[in-house]
Amino acid sequence: MRLSFILAATLTGLLACATASDSEKIIRISNEQVLSDRQLLDTVVNDNEKRFLRAYNDAEDDSEDPKNVKNTVDAKPADESEDSELSEEERFSLIQMSNQPRYYWWFQHEMTPRDVRRALGLRAGSIKLVKRSIYRGYVKYYNKHCSYYENRKKDFCKAKEY
């Protein structure tokens, strides 16, 4: 009786381990397929990025003189500052979207951006990126909502010092 019980428990354990290892293999295969599909998409994105990074020679730089030839690797696109601003906005857009209720509450309690800066504990030289992005998001929210007709004449909307 004891021997049959031990054999049954052992076989059940081995069967459970075999099924678990089979299911892990299936998951790994599907993850590899997903990654390969993602890599296909990434190559298209990388091609577009390379296209944007190309630098075109000006009419003045057409000479073959090595002093006048510029290296295309070191050349930067003209819209670099705009691209960096867009990427920064994308980076903090999730934070700003999640803070909309906070912005609404601050605005309903008639807090100016200066009051919000004090509430967040920001100073001129502080390096708190998340709090700075929250503050910048509120400044945008404040400017947008103070431009509405019903809010223009409110005292806290007339404050222009941030």
UniProtKB/Swiss-Prot annotation:
UniProt induction comment: Expression is induced during host plant infection.
Main location: secreted
Domain of life: Eukaryota
Motif (RxLR-dEER): 51-91
Keywords recorded for this protein, A-Z: Host cytoplasm, Host nucleus, Secreted, Signal, Virulence
One of the record's GO cellular component terms: host cell nucleolus
Region described as Disordered: spans on this chain: 56-88
Transmembrane segments: none
Subcellular location: Secreted; Host cytoplasm; Host nucleus, Host nucleolus; Host nucleus
Presence of keyword Signal: yes
Signal peptide: 1-20
Keyword RNA-binding listed: no
Function: Effector that enhances P.infestans colonization of Nicotiana benthamiana leaves.
Family: Belongs to the RxLR effector family.
Domains: entry comment: The RxLR-dEER motif acts to carry the protein into the host cell cytoplasm through binding to cell surface phosphatidylinositol-3-phosphate.
UniProt name for this protein: RxLR effector protein PITG_06094
Organism: Phytophthora infestans (strain T30-4) (Potato late blight agent)
